[in-house]
């Protein structure tokens, strides 16, 4: 191991060459600012929870950063990039197209499928820096509201029950 190699090098008074770590060059994150009007910037994120039978479920949340309006709360066991794309297309058909969508670096968001769809639709995907959820503060705050208002208080038996409750809460929240 590296400690033993280091010790032997020191005992033999050899010069130890320490390689510098290669750093990934990342793009600068988009600054978190309040948009001037609706539909300029949306934020999206996932949440995890369990049904009463301990099956893991995911919630996909989308909000408008201008007025924090909940645009979409979708629930399923697995939410791949194609599913995210379809959910966003439904919201766009209802609300119109945003200029930018802010998201984290999850596998669904960095997939080629979602990137090519966003490029085709002329929507910029703004990625936050890894390990800095505060750069996506609007959706993180919304996730906290979801968790403390209803998700942490109820046990749901099925996906249909959870989706129905989420949709009703979304209309009440807005």
PLM feature spans:
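Charged DNA-binding/catalytic regions of mobile-element recombinases
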Residues: 1-174
């Amino acid at each position: 191991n590296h400690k033993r190699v280091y010790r032997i090098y020191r005992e033999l008074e050899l010069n130890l060459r320490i390689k510098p770590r290669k750093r990934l060059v990342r793009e600068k994150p988009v600054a978190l600012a309040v948009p001037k009007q609706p539909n300029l910037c949306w934020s999206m994120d996932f949440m995890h929870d369990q049904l009463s039978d301990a099956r893991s479920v995911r919630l996909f949340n989308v909000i408008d950063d201008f007025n924090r309006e909940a645009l979409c709360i979708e629930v399923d066991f697995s939410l791949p990039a194609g599913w995210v794309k379809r959910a966003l297309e439904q919201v766009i058909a209802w609300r119109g197209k945003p200029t930018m969508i802010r998201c984290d670096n999850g596998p669904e968001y960095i997939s080629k499928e979602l990137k090519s769809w966003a490029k085709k639709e002329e929507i910029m995907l703004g990625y936050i820096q890894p390990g800095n959820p505060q750069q996506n503060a609007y959706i993180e705050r919304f996730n906290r509201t979801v968790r403390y208002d209803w998700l942490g208080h109820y046990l749901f038996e099925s996906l249909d029950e959870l989706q129905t409750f989420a949709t009703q809460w979304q209309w009440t929240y807005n």
